[in-house]
Amino acid sequence: HGIHGIRKDKKGRIYLIGGNDAKFSGHEDLKQYRGIEGGGIIRYTSELKEPILICHGFRNPYDFDFNSEGQIYTYDSDCEREFVLPWYSPTRLYRVEDRAHHGWRLPGYKRGWKRPDYYFDSVKPLVNVGRGSPTGVMVYKHTAFPEYYHDAVFYCDWTFGKVFMTPTSTNSIGAEFPSSEVFLESMGTNGFAPTDIEL
């Protein structure tokens, strides 16, 4: 639940994602931000200076990626101990919104407290996936696959051994998104626990 993925954008700026025990709240680099809850994303210059809090309110996202427009996508974890309880919050795919709270409020891993998706001041997930352990995230920026997959988000579940895919639009602000599709999974007794995905 600490610091996880690191990526660069097209301008060479460095982004860092961390879970709800990454201790972003109260960190010397982020002392100008008050009320940080859960995990978040920080952006630095290419020289690792001038940190900016992009967003917060995550439980434990491992990875993230940018689409062709520079929008960030991440896959956040659930609190598996609360599965089937009324307040359970499933794993979920987000299109990250700048300076926004994405719902998760507590540190630690033993219990959860996520704002409901209908709260006006929380970002609603693009897709609520269900039980799982989110790991790698990649936006497909290539031409080998059919156009249907261009700019689609691929994201991995370690627990159930699946790679999900959610197609997006090149004009993704306000676009409609379908449910997750299983792109890849193991069969029979073959083990498959994806931890990362790259292109």
Predicted regions and their residues:
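Beta-propeller domains with acidic blade repeats across secreted/periplasmic ectodomains
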Residues: 1-199
